[in-house]
Amino acid sequence: MSDRAIKNLNLRIGLIDLQVRAVSEPAPYHIGSCMLNCIPCQPATNSITANLTLDPSTAHPWLYVSQDLKSVRWKEMKQQVNASPLRYELLASVLSQESFNSGKLCWEVEVVEEGEWWGVGIVRESANRNGQILFDPRGGYWGVQRISGKHQAITHPRTNLTLSHSPRRIRVSLDYSQGLIAFFDGDTNAELFTFPKANFAGEKVHAWFLIYKWNGQLLLHP
């Protein structure tokens, strides 16, 4: 890819970045609101640890999914991939192959190194992946991110998270029937953020992952 083409693509992605990056206003969400039944991966909660794999057919062309479908990297080198309405073309994201419309589930994502932007969470199957993306729960996205050195919950407006350190593992907890979505530090079990109850209306949701301008990778566990 020529330098000019890379510059143009960076500009397009940068426009998406500007659309979805943090808003400085305080948001009406609260940390510490997670009830006992949304604490993830504990025997008393009857949560199932989901064994996720990544779906390459949804991956942005600059995201490289490993052969075992368990990790994803960003490289500033566009792959030759088949065009598809399922594929992210602007937001540097990839989804899980698995989808869910019931049950209590949890999974962990290891953050290897850090860079400009990473995010993890869940997304409605019908949520926009290209064009005008409403990048928060109104548009079917629930998650946490680190962008420009700040940890945030992807709310409207964004909620800044005050953390003592950048988590090495992020644990995602989903209770589909109760509409509970919570995020934890996978090493300490400290709650990072819990979203207000969501109504999925029976629609399937996928695990969602984002990396942009970053030399590290996201690893799925188990």
Please identify what each model-predicted range represents.
Residues M1-P222:
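Beta-rich ligand-recognition domains in immune and ubiquitin systems
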